[in-house]
From Swiss-Prot:
Cellular component GO terms, alphabetical: nucleoplasm; PeBoW complex; preribosome, large subunit precursor
Gene3D superfamilies to which the protein is assigned, alphabetical: YVTN repeat-like/Quinoprotein amine dehydrogenase (2.130.10.10)
Record-level GO BP terms: maturation of 5.8S rRNA from tricistronic rRNA transcript (SSU-rRNA, 5.8S rRNA, LSU-rRNA); maturation of LSU-rRNA from tricistronic rRNA transcript (SSU-rRNA, 5.8S rRNA, LSU-rRNA)
Family of this protein: Belongs to the WD repeat BOP1/ERB1 family.
InterPro entries noted in UniProt: BOP1/Erb1 (IPR028598), BOP1_N_dom (IPR012953), WD40/YVTN_repeat-like_dom_sf (IPR015943), WD40_repeat_dom_sf (IPR036322), WD40_rpt (IPR001680)
Protein name: Ribosome biogenesis protein BOP1 homolog
GO molecular function: ribonucleoprotein complex binding
Composition skew (Basic and acidic residues), residue ranges: 15-28
Keywords (A to Z) from UniProt: Nucleus, Repeat, Ribosome biogenesis, rRNA processing, WD repeat
Compartments (UniProt record): Nucleus, Nucleolus; Nucleus, Nucleoplasm
Alphabetized PROSITE patterns for the sequence: WD_REPEATS_2 (PS50082), WD_REPEATS_REGION (PS50294)
Region listing for Disordered, in residue ranges: 1-28
């Protein structure tokens, strides 16, 4: 038992006697009291290394609450409590910052203190406050804005009442005190002592003579509701010269007018009175129809219904579309670079080499075809034709130096320009030599024959236009005359020609091939028809809205047609949207002679006989969500009018640069650059 009691720890029991707490007593293992006195332990001295700070790092900046940027140009950031300057700490380089970011685990919780120029490490409490502010919570840590609510009154409906005491008898017996009070009041009324409430004196309301009629200070709700739906009566017409007491002579009726006025019905009279003339105002008698007219006006105001007309007050400038800044739509041609002179007479057609755009071919009224260097503007070669040139077109194949020329005398010539890469020139010579012009059928309408460096096609009629297919083997020609067989399609590799149309559908003005498909667009005076050459069927008939089409062009994908007319109109046909124009513009004052769309840039140009070339920013979107964009950006002038009112006859774009080239009736070719 002794060992057991020795193993038991000392117990300290609390005993209370008479509500007082006894002091603690400790006993040993034999039950004897131990006398233990409290010992005062001195506090442990603070370790100087627990607070890791030096005198230099513990400086306090005493500049106060002023912008720290005032010290940007100084070599210090302020002053300490002794008035000494606090030097700026050395700035860390990018390498030191990167190493500290990688090696210091507490880098993310350090912020830069502008007052001391050092990084301060945030505590956990500060970080938690910042997190609460960033997440939209209360900055105070542990704050709960939604404390539990203690509902004092129970929401449960009880059957039994809380207090079930019976009602006292006094509740059912009339009160004697109230009876005595009522009897006193009755006696006072009988004796005349009790007096009722005094009547309030009505205040005198003075009428404000100068108040506005529209004032709403003392208006009732019913009056206000009537005022909202009130329609003011039309005002009486102002008097005219005929109602004057001394009107001019032309207002006085003669005998014929007087008789006509008297015989006319009252409703048919222009004036409901007969003008009179007096020498002085004092001689004017009383108006005999005054009461009648006022009565009729009262009837009109009372019986005639009124109608409220809503007028839209809109600023005309708000109805105009918002146009972008032309500087944001660059590049586009703005400046005349130089002229190319050499033709005598009109320059009717021009075309540019399709690959690099180094060469330009032009055909004129003087019967010459000239090859120009675009970079220098010099003529490097000239071909003399037997008639006036009406159309020229470079072959779209890059490795061929072929040029199709239509000129008067019912001829179409395929020339080898002999300019450019020597290998391409030799390949073109071999191609022309291999063309089977001898294997022609007897009685052919179009005859092919070779003549030195060119192929000659004898046409049945004068040719207006010649154009190539994108693959370079087929080209089409259009006759000037209004006949059924005005369009011919020629195949260069087989030296054959055929007329795809046997019936006359209208006077054909221009044709062009689809860039990617075997289709042909044929433009008459007012319509454009799209034919499928593979199936020989009509695909679509377009209603252009032009009275007389003069030119036609397509974009690189063949999904849009651009038309110009002699009626000064320019039409943009979006083939995916329907058979009607998407845009119709009339920016020219004379006939539109040519339209061209750039292959690389969203640029469109039209030239006219008014001596101007309109440059448009024409953005075509393949996405059906976005609509096409068309903005006029520049109007160019370079040519002079001739006596027959002709000016700009043709235009084309450089294939790789935003340069515009125009041909004029004054015998010059103009190049516009940006």
């Amino acid at each position: 038992m002794a060992s057991t009691s020795a193993a038991t720890p000392l117990k300290n029991k609390r005993k209370f006697e008479n509500g007082k707490k006894k002091p603690k007593t400790l006993k040993d293992e034999f039950g004897e009291k131990l006398d233990i006195k409290p010992v005062i332990v001195p506090p442990k001295p603070a370790d100087e290394y627990d607070y890791d700070s030096s005198d230099e790092e513990d400086l306090r900046n005493t500049i106060g609450n002023i912008p720290i940027k005032w010290y940007d140009d100084e070599d210090h950031i302020g002053y300490d409590k002794f008035g000494e300057k606090i030097a700026k700490p050395a700035k860390k380089g990018e390498i030191e910052t990167f190493l500290e970011k990688m090696e210091d685990p507490d880098y993310w919780r350090k912020v830069f203190d502008k007052q001391t120029g050092t990084d301060v490490k945030l505590t956990d409490e500060q970080i938690e406050k910042i997190h609460n502010i960033a997440t939209g919570k209360y900055p105070t840590i542990g704050y709960n804005p939604y404390e539990p609510f203690l509902d004092i009154f129970s929401s449960q409906k009880e059957i039994h009442p809380i207090d079930n005491r019976p009602e006292p008898k006094s509740r059912f017996i009339p009160s004697k005190d109230e009876m005595r009070m009522v009897s006193r009041m009755v006696h006072a009324i009988k004796m005349g002592w009790a007096k009722g409430p005094r009547a309030k004196k009505e205040e005198h309301k003075s009428y404000d003579l100068w108040a506005s009629e529209d004032a709403l200070d003392n208006v009732t709700k019913s009056q206000l509701s009537r005022m909202r739906v009130h329609m003011p009566a039309p005002k009486v017409a102002l008097p005219t010269h005929a109602e004057s007491y001394n009107p001019p002579e032309e207002y006085i009726f003669d005998d014929e007018e007087r008789k006509k006025w008297e015989e006319a019905e009252k409703e048919d009279r222009v004036l409901n009175f007969m003008p009179s003339k007096y020498d002085a105002l004092r001689k004017v008698p009383q108006y005999d129809k005054f009461i009648t007219e006022r009565f009729e006006r009262c009837l009109d105001l009372y019986l005639a219904p009124r109608q409220r007309k809503m007028r839209i007050h809109a600023d005309p400038t708000d109805l105009l579309p918002d146009l972008p800044n032309p500087n944001d739509l660059r590049p586009f041609p703005t400046t005349l670079a130089f002229y190319m002179r050499g033709h005598t007479g009109q320059v009717r057609a021009i075309t540019v080499e399709p690959e690099r755009g180094e060469l330009l071919a032009s055909g004129g009224e003087d019967g010459t075809v000239r090859i120009w260097m675009i970079a220098t503007g010099r003529c490097i070669k000239t071909f003399q034709m037997d008639g006036e040139v009406t159309s020229v077109s470079f072959s779209p194949v890059a490795d061929r130096t072929l040029l199709a020329v239509a000129y008067e005398g019912k001829y179409v010539a395929i020339l080898n320009t002999g300019c450019g890469d020597r290998l391409h020139v030799q390949q073109t010579e071999a191609l022309l030599a291999e063309t089977p012009t001898d294997a022609q059928e007897d009685g052919a309408v179009v005859t092919w024959r070779k003549s030195k460096e060119k192929l000659m096609l004898k046409m049945p009629n004068e040719v207006r236009q010649v154009t190539w297919h994108s693959k370079g083997d087929y080209f089409a020609s259009v006759a000037i005359d209004d006949i059924a067989k005005s369009v011919y399609v020629h195949q260069l590799s087989k030296a054959k020609s055929q007329c795809p149309f046997q019936k006359r559908k209208g006077h054909v003005q221009a044709v062009t091939f689809h860039p990617t498909q075997a289709r042909l667009f044929v433009a008459t005076k007012i319509h454009v028809r799209e034919y499928d050459l593979a199936r020989c069927v009509l695909v679509k008939k377009l209603i252009t809205g032009c009275k007389h089409i003069s030119t036609m062009a397509t974009d690189a994908n063949g999904e849009n047609l651009f038309l110009g007319g002699l009626d000064r109109r320019f039409c943009w046909m979006d083939l995916q949207m329907g058979n009607k124009p998407w845009k119709k513009l009339k920016h020219h004052t004379a006939a539109v002679r040519s339209v061209a769309y750039h292959k690389k840039y969203p640029l469109l140009a039209t030239v006219s006989d008014d001596g101007t070339a309109m440059v448009y920013y024409a953005r075509i979107y393949t996405d059906f969500v976005k609509d096409n964009e068309l903005y006029p950006v520049k109007r160019l002038r370079a040519h002079e009018k001739t006596p027959n009112d002709l000016c700009m006859l043709h235009t084309t774009w450089h294939p790789t640069q935003p340069w515009l080239i125009t041909a004029g009736a004054d015998g010059t070719i103009a190049l516009f650059t940006y």
